[in-house]
Amino acid sequence: MHIVENNKIQNTCLIFIEVESLAQQTKLENDYEEFCSLVSSCDTRIKEKIKLNQKIPSTKTFISQGKLENIKTVISQNDIDLIIINHKLTASQNRNLELYLNKRVIDKTELILDIFASRATSHIGKLQVELAQLNHLSTRLIRGWTHLERQKGGIGL
């Protein structure tokens, strides 16, 4: 579950979303710099940085539909493999973004866990990080098997 898979450095798009209902204006610039330095500490190639302003996050994708269209065109023009968003996404938001953009999307929590995983040196440290990653992943598995919910049943089946 690492950002770098198969020793291939991925082309990354950073999406920094300023949500008015969640943010304090004085912290935003520091948050942007912190987010960029977090991503630069991973083995990725940052090809694009997108800064968005939004009043209220969308419950379906966290990003409004019009801005998603713009992001999709930027991604297709720049050969992007990975999208990193500076907010914590719900499992359904993450899944909806990945389905819409056809790219891997990770949030800030997954990014931080991946950084810890790449830098853990002791056996116990590696196990603790892996446990944290699996706990985070377990919340993402909900509704992943909805295609099996309506199975046929009856006598002889």
Identify the residue ranges that each predicted region occupies.
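Extended, highly charged alpha-helical segments
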Residues: 111-157
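N-terminal accessory targeting/assembly segments
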Residues: 1-114
